[in-house]
Curated annotation (Swiss-Prot):
CDD domains: PRTases_typeI. This is Adenine phosphoribosyltransferase. Catalyzes a salvage reaction resulting in the formation of AMP, that is energically less costly than de novo synthesis. It comes from the Bacteria. Homodimer. Belongs to the purine/pyrimidine phosphoribosyltransferase family.
Amino acid sequence: MNLKEHIRVIENFPKEGISFKDVTTILQDGKVLNYTVDKLAENLKDKKIDKIVGPEARGFLFGTPLAYKLGVGFVPVRKKGKLPYETISCKYDLEYGQDELQIHKDSIKKGDKVAIVDDLLATGGTIASVVKLVEELGGEVVNVSFVIELTDLKGKDKLEGYDINSLVQYNI
């Protein structure tokens, strides 16, 4: 299956000059969703994963079914103030300002082998923050996987030294 054929591209969204890669078309088709989750799982088959971690919001959409398929837990990483229990935080830079991500303190145990999953790798700032949170809790990041990678934005540079997979690549 050519997954790229199932990703809707919307020009000038959310603003002029942006070419938005819409994964809702993957989610709407059961066969395509199954294929996507199976391909993500294939990249992890030889790793002994304890947890899948996914950032808000689209990391939840692929991370949860992947965790189910692998028989492991799923850990959400959310924006500040959205998780109900004790958290740790990591700030990261945006184009104009900063944002903050949080994870529950008890979600990752020391030595847990963790795979991080998200829909898209662009500049790498969000995922680099997720890596920091997992490692601060004592987890070992054994893989970082994406459905889509925007290669021209060089997000992999912020993840140097980690095993990284993406199913579809776009040059923007």
